[in-house]
Amino acid sequence: QPREPFHPLFGGMPYTPLSLEFQITQENLGHAGHLVYLGTLFEEVLQSDTYENGKGSTVSKVLQNYQKTHGISAIAGVPNIGTDLNWTGHLFGQANWYAFGRLAWNPDTSSGKIAEDWARMTFSNDKSVLSLVLKIMMMSRETYVNYTMPLGLNHIMNYDTHNGPEPWHDDPVWTAFDYHKITKDSIGVNRTAKGTGATRQYHNPVGEMFDDIKQCPQEYLL
């Protein structure tokens, strides 16, 4: 999805080596037709606090928990290349491969720093060029989320391609109602302790935040 919270397995399995898989290909992010810099998405996940050992127990630190996991750690990526000479369909798609590599090497690197390094190597060191390119890159993912997945809604997309609208698709497990539970009285899936209980899988205060409609960030609300 354009945005999801981190999985509660990170922070819930302290003695088990875990690998984080990022999707580099833009399956749910506009394919090669939309400029979406994924470095900010990757950083958002890696810097999410699991509170496994109190404040500061980020997903990044969970992945680097070498003492408990016998020195084993990994980050995987799922890319997709086409027949274009630049592989990715548009030039900025290459920035996502670059961002993945940099963060796999050092998961605490700033996505802004990575974007700047890539822009300098790709375009120019000219300040006016960098300013414009970085502005576009750093806002691109959030912009895509806002025009395709408002309020945390998901799967508003074509069934086959995961790109573009298809409200006429008739499938009992791929409809707005199935995913959004829209009725005349409400919208959204109740994942709180009074619903599916999914929020209980997170350490507090993360679980408490997701469990409270007044505290839950709007981007995760539905």
Model-derived features with residue positions:
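Active-site capping/gating regions of soluble enzymes
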Residues: 1-72
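Catalytic domains of carbohydrate-active enzymes that cleave complex glycans
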Residues: 54-222
